[in-house]
Amino acid sequence: MSKIQSAENFVKERYLGTIRKDANISHYEHLTAVVTRLKNLGVTDEDTLAAAWLQDIIDYTNTSFDELDQRFGSSVAVLVLSMSKDKSLPKSIQEEQYVKQLKESTLDAKLIKLCDISSSIKNLKNSPLSRTRKIKEMKKKLYYLNVIKPDLIKNKDQIPGIAGFVNGVNEVITSYGLRPVVFQ
């Protein structure tokens, strides 16, 4: 079984029956959309695709870095960790540290995050949350998008699909009265 298939199966097991709090879909459906988007960008690297399946697993389950390292190797585990919040820190510092991690993360991590943001914002549009709550969630996702944007812009010619995802995000957010992300 491939590492990607193992990661997908692991996610199915760990997220069994869980629904995302910001949308009325399962974690598995969201992660399927993230991985599909990544493949649409032309990503074929096994470690990157496995990490995309596992990107939220440290944040939302009792899965540890060591367990990921043991099951999927250090490359996947480090990539997942770069997209995870450090729950041992106080809440106020957690967010600051997370933003720093995103800024310093690899292009692969930033591409996964872009696909995560794209899927999350699309799902928010159809979410049962109030308009005010949707806008609040969108603003948070847009903040993360702006953090990773410089590296995405640098690589938009090599990975042309990046601009399409940003345009898709802009389509949704402007319908909520938010300013579009400038991507040039």
Could you say what each language-model-derived stretch is?
Residues 1-184:
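Active-site helical microenvironments for divalent-metal-assisted chemistry
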